[in-house]
């Protein structure tokens, strides 16, 4: 999910390697680690395909006023992948909790509502005439993808209304709510890796705000290798104690 299809493809390979490690090693919660890794592998492969076949436009402050259908369809898939992530994390929480089943059940329902409501608003935007746009934001003149200032993909959306359309802050809050409610270190390492990836990506790669949603290439290194390191260390401690 970085600068070009070659980079996205390389990070896809890293996901394949780490996912294979989870399957072979089978630590506690290996299915959740595999679910996490497989989802972001899907995102990396998707962005590889988008760079290759998605007809991505060049940099634009307000996005494209007219967007070809192939680009539009790729951008809709990007929206779906973005908003499946909070659902992913609440489902992982539900699968691994022993005391907060009710909480994660409610949170999953909330995340599903945000997902489907946002999708409804997105499709409603195709029938709405042009309205005001915000420069360098996720809201564009059309639902379309272009290359950003620092070379990352920029996914812009034209919803039916801007006022209640889920945004970056909504996304981060919903993800973090799941992380803070995880019950043990074996699952908290997923949230820690995700948060560290976000921080390091912003500091090291310095994507603009509008590019941040697609700038998750370091997640394959930071989050997955953090999980692998945790599994390796915790397994070693367990064996030592036998």
Curated annotation (Swiss-Prot):
Transmembrane segments: 4-24, 34-54, 74-94, 106-126, 162-182, 189-209, 217-237
Topological category with respect to the lipid bilayer: Multi-pass membrane protein
Keywords: Glycoprotein, Membrane, Transmembrane, Transmembrane helix
Glycosylation sites: 73, 185
Localization (cell): Membrane
GO annotation, cellular component aspect: membrane
Subcellular location, principal: membrane
Keyword Glycoprotein: yes
Name of protein: Uncharacterized protein R287
């Amino acid at each position: 999910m970085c600068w070009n299809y070659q980079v996205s493809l390389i990070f896809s390979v890293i996901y394949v390697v780490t996912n294979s490690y989870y399957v072979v090693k089978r630590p506690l919660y290996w299915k959740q680690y595999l679910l996490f890794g497989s989802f972001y592998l899907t995102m990396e492969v998707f962005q590889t395909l988008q760079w290759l076949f998605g007809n991505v436009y060049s940099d634009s402050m307000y996005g494209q006023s007219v967007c070809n259908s192939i680009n539009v369809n790729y951008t809709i898939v990007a929206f779906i992948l973005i908003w499946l992530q909070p659902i992913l994390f609440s489902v992982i929480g539900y699968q691994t909790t022993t005391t907060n089943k009710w909480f994660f059940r409610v949170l999953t329902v909330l995340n599903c509502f945000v997902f489907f409501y946002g999708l409804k608003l997105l499709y409603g935007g195709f029938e709405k005439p042009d309205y005001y746009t915000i420069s360098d934001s996720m809201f564009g003149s059309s639902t379309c993808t272009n290359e950003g200032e620092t070379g990352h993909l920029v996914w812009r959306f034209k919803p039916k209304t801007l006022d209640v359309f889920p945004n970056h802050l909504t996304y981060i809050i919903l993800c973090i709510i799941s992380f803070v409610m995880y019950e043990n270190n074996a699952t908290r390492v997923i949230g820690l890796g995700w948060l560290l990836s976000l921080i390091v990506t912003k500091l090291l790669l310095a994507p603009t705000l509008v590019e941040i949603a697609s700038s998750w290439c370091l997640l394959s290194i930071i989050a997955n290798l953090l999980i692998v390191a945790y599994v390796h260390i915790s397994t070693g401690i367990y064996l030592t104690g036998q």
